[in-house]
Amino acid sequence: MRDHIVIKGARENNLKNIDVEIPRDALVVMTGLSGSGKSSLAFDTIFAEGQRRYMESLSSYARQFLGQMDKPDVDSIEGMSPAISIDQKTTSKNPRSTVGTVTEIYDYLRLLWARVGVPHCPKCGKEIRRQTVDQIVDQIAALPQATRVQILAPVVRARKGEHQKVFDDARRGGYVRVRVDGSIYDLTEVIPLDKNRKHNIEIVVDRVVIRPDQNRRLTDAVEIASALSGGLVLADIPEEKREILFSQNYACDDCGISIEELTPRMFSFNSPYGACPTCGGLGTRLRIDPALIIPDPSKSILDGGITASGWNSVKGDSISRMYYEALAEKYHFDLTTPIGDLPENVREILLYGTGDEELTLHYDTNRGAGVLRRPFEGIVCNLERRYQETQSDAMRASLEDCMAETACPDCRGARLRPEVLAVTVGGLNISEFTALPITEELAFLDSLELSEKDAKIADSILREVRSRLQFLQSVGLQYLTLARSAATLSGGESQRIRLATQIGSSLMGVLYILDEPSIGLHQRDNEKLLATLRELRDLGNTLIVVEHDEDTMRAADYLIDIGPGAGVHGGEVVCAGTPEEVARCERSITGQYLSGKKKIPVPAHRRTGNGHALVIRGAAEHNLKHVDVEIPLGVMTCVTGVSGSSKSSLVNEVLYKTLVGKLNHAKVRPGKCDGIDGVEYLDKIINIDQSPIGRTPRSNPATYTGLFDDIRALFASTQDAKLRGYGAGRFSFNIRGGRCEACSGDGLLKIEMNFLPDVYVPCEVCKGKRYNRETLEVHYKGRNIAEVLDMTVEEALAFFQNQPKIRDRLQTLMDVGLGYVKLGQPSTTLSGGEAQRIKLATELSKRSTGRTIYVLDEPTTGLHVADVARLIDILDRLTDAGNTVLVIEHNLHVIKVADHIIDLGPEGGDAGGNIVFTGTPEDCARCTESYTGKFLKKELES
């Protein structure tokens, strides 16, 4: 067996026909500047080829459903293993996905609660026991005399298939009718069923009229139904349109409530047998939120204080104004009074209506004038009714601006039916258990006392649950709960969850490719992650990790530095070897930082700010413990703390959402806090994250930064364009006129290939240039619009040197290190770090007011140390212009250059949410209670 993976002639994206040898069964780290070609080699070449070879081993029928990957642009790869990619882009946004379901721990928990759970009555809480035939008969016989009852035997419950054998058996048993999915059929007819849908089938055993002389017949029917269905009896009362399910398995004597024998699917919130019927297993419902109807209570009704659709007009002839005036007349208030100052009962009436009390409405329209008398339903009730009744997607979207997710009123966020939540193990129901942090769940399982019989049943289940929980703990996720929605996880958290799942699978001989697993991880937990990676390697696997973290690089068995620059300046193997060998390589920028020849300097002076501050009072969102925080304005503040210490809750949920509502007038529900003081010193808040700058290939750096508008205007001002009568719109590939209509301005045509992957071919008409022939005949300095879009930022800067407006925008893109990016490069091909730097460049090109607060959540994601140095320069420029920069960060290079630090903790989850330290980095390094301070001290001293 080969001891190396040998790659020859890799040319994917910007790779320059490189040859690489990667040792097998080793921890291999690939590093290099953002855009240097690391991901092109690791994911687009090695992983893509591993996946493609696996797909080729399948039948063409299977490939039709799975899709197939293109062969990467590489001459050969030898020594490949089956490849598994663990990246950050596959976080599930499905509201039904939780940490428990993603890790499959919840499947084991469902089995545990079904096998050893103790059922209780959901009404009285009494432990439930099985029902006998006599008890079932007595309850049916207690119905009003002359009631008609059908006794049914549920033989198939929510199972796919045609079930013809069930019908044949029923015919042979002498039965005449069955009920299928709620409809009665005669067994003499053919009953066709869709085998791909789930069906419910009940055999009609007897039809009984409740009378004293029918007890014998009723008993026989119940016994037969129970025997047919394995203990279940369904009493259908057609006149009352209701059914009663009885079980010889479990029932409450006092309340008469029956439940089926416990099965794992009853504990699934994704199954109709377990899901709360009110919210369908989501745990939340979209409800009209009064805070989004009246986002600013300091405004009056006439000042536009009510922003809800249909109620935001205060024109004299509007229906809403007619209602407001009638309400003001009846309840004696002024429409110019701030809504927050109105009496409590008036605000209640505005939102929830007058009940049966009528208003006197005066109308005056083109059709005439008059008086109406009618009650007022209230803005909240009106919006909820319109939301339920409308068929318009646009109206639904408009009304959702006033809605917020609230806990389901019935299950209170637990997602399951009441009878399922009444089943306990060790005194906890399954929802209560999954709401515990992982550390507490492990402690609960260790102290769980079961009977000898139950302990034997649960032994193997508990072993699996424990090992998976311990894996999550080993990758630094001990603060998470299994009930946590997967959609709320950061990229780093979701990646480490999948990493823990892979360790649990104990596979050997696999090639794992990971994308920055250290993201979002505090230095304190880094060693745990490295131990996990080593464990995965020691099982006999090869790990290729794309990473910039210095600790991970030093822990590698083999380090590959791709570069030397980014984009067209990268794509080569600068150096490959042990970390010590790379550190000695003069040509390697990574090596220079590893050896200490290059470093990011600590600033000689810290900014002290403009004397003003934002003060957050009583922040209590998620795990925050009613903390008060002061954020100085005019400086760069770094919010730090271990993973799960509530950094994002404080900055993104409380601060950002409150300020974006007040300053940018956005409709969002902010996190819980008593208030924020000092907002008057700011005029806007901007969140610069790593989300894509566009979702389609039509979006590119030129369109996002506004550069393309200036370039189109320049082309429209040329002599060629004026002679032809072309305006700036002629040079857009998004509208008819100048674009190529054969490909609608895409430059590519998609050819569907059925069981082969879709093929994208250049448009035969425009040859991929996006524009029609006439548009491409217009030139500026000898170049047409398509040729300009194909330029890199660096080339364009030289080309447009005499156009100050365009030159300045291009210069900011150069300043943020994006000289290698093409102006027309589709936004879908940009990395998160590149997208973020384009946003930063756009902000740098704007005229600063000095009153803006910029929020960045882990901006160093995907950035090499050299890129981090450039990022720090940009943040310094924004701060030096008088603005405030607030950064959530674990990267010590950023933390050490901050003017002010807010350290949260001390731990993650419930043990976090407190302010551990505030002050300068030097003072933080001296704080013994701060984990950040301990690592910062080493960084400042180095």
Segments from the language model and where they lie:
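Conserved phosphate-binding elements of NTP-dependent enzyme cores
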Residues: M1-S942
